[in-house]
Amino acid sequence: MTPPILRRLDDLRALRRDWMKKGDTLGLVPTMGALHAGHLSLVEAAKAACDHVVVTIFVNPKQFNSPEDLANYPRTEHEDAQKLAPYGVDAIYVPDPDQIYPEGYATTVSLTGVTDVMEGPNRPGHFEGVATVVAKLFLQSGADRAFFGEKDYQQLMVVRRMARDLDIPIEVIGCPTVREASGLAMSSRNMRLSAAATKTAGQLNPLMEAAATRLRAGEDYAPLEAEMRAQLSDLGFAEIEYIDLRCAQDLTSLDRLDRPARMFVAAWLDGVRLIDNIAV
């Protein structure tokens, strides 16, 4: 059965009030739509942990750096609802724009530290947009838990810090990245890749895993980074924004593996910006 679609905040809050009266818990899965198996894995995690699940779909204009990127982002509400039908989701919250940014809206949520590296400098204003809309969705829904993919690991850390700093009583749960058979991290942007580029993109994760194996064996990071840059360039990646080794807890930069860490990559292929990260 296709879940009901809610477009007004009052309708979402009415549902939440009914559940709270029963002492039921709510899991929130925030998305921008164009759902794939990665999103559906978050829904499964939410269903396993909570009495009720609401999936949100909102293409947030404030987290896009390019008007073209915003215009090209896929909008597939009907297909998304069909994909969610077998999962027993209680509702899909697809707020009208004025439910998130009403006339005269003047507040943004801005963080420092965790936003100062990687995606922060490369996408100015992006994390302000993310933190602002996610804070609103947390407060609007009153959810007990929210589920995010580790594919966007820096975003996960931003959301956790934001909720902690603003005393929003919600548990932010990170879920493992879901990958294609090739190892390519699932992303709504992948559908914009040509067949040839999709095949090339599938080589990114094996390169990262090979580098991680060498790091665990004691190799220094700088030579590995240079080698990976050359390999990606040879494969046809047009621009490599960063290949970073960072502490998994605070995202400080590392030059060798001396604590729990993650490797992060952002690069352009076939006009599409791809990001990935793995535990090391």
UniProtKB/Swiss-Prot annotation:
Top enzyme category: ligase
Residues that hold ATP according to the record: 32-39, 149-152, 178, 186-189
Family: Belongs to the pantothenate synthetase family.
Catalytic center residues: 39
Additional information: The reaction proceeds by a bi uni uni bi ping pong mechanism.
Residues that, per the record, bind beta-alanine: 63
Main localization category: cytoplasm
Catalytic activity from the UniProt record: (R)-pantoate + beta-alanine + ATP = (R)-pantothenate + AMP + diphosphate + H(+)
Function: Catalyzes the condensation of pantoate with beta-alanine in an ATP-dependent reaction via a pantoyl-adenylate intermediate.
Species for this entry: Ruegeria sp. (strain TM1040)
Record PANTHER family: CYTIDYLATE KINASE/PANTOATE-BETA-ALANINE LIGASE, PANTOATE--BETA-ALANINE LIGASE
Superkingdom of source: Bacteria
Keyword annotations: ATP-binding, Cytoplasm, Ligase, Nucleotide-binding, Pantothenate biosynthesis, Plasmid
Binding site for (R)-pantoate: 63, 155
EC number: 6.3.2.1
Single GO molecular function: ATP binding
Pfam families linked to this entry: Pantoate_ligase
The gene coding this protein: panC
GO biological process: pantothenate biosynthetic process
Protein name: Pantothenate synthetase
